[in-house]
């Protein structure tokens, strides 16, 4: 979102195992990402994204109409619950040596089942870049590192990734650690 809105920002990579005490005081859940903007500290990725959309309204990443905005928020919620939560399980169990094959298969299957939706428009269910794309693209970027392999039937998703991973704003949004993921 910050790159899409061309906002200058200082990004600090934080190891969750070494969560800074100063951040822990402001974020009782010790989750990432955290946004610090002057005296304001926000956590929870959805809240951070919506704050950035309101703080930096141009270019808009949410539609102008309340019904369309609500539908987009619902999509973001589903992406979080259906896909991002699975990715979190995979990451945490990979570190702990747990078996994540079933979660990987479920995530791949769920993504593949909606692959046709990626073929209809340039962006995900939209003609323009939106917060939904900002929510979804980082997850798709991380799939190889999560050990999630999509089948050929997911071609519309591969095409979507090919279109957006090369965008200047997407590339600008990647940290050095993220660049090494692919």
What are these regions (language model features)?
Residues 79-173:
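GST-like fold's C-terminal all-alpha helical module
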Residues 1-111, 115, 122:
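GST-like domain detector, emphasizing the conserved glutathione-binding G-site
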Residues 177-182:
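Acidic/histidine-enriched, glycine/proline-rich intrinsically disordered or flexible terminal extensions
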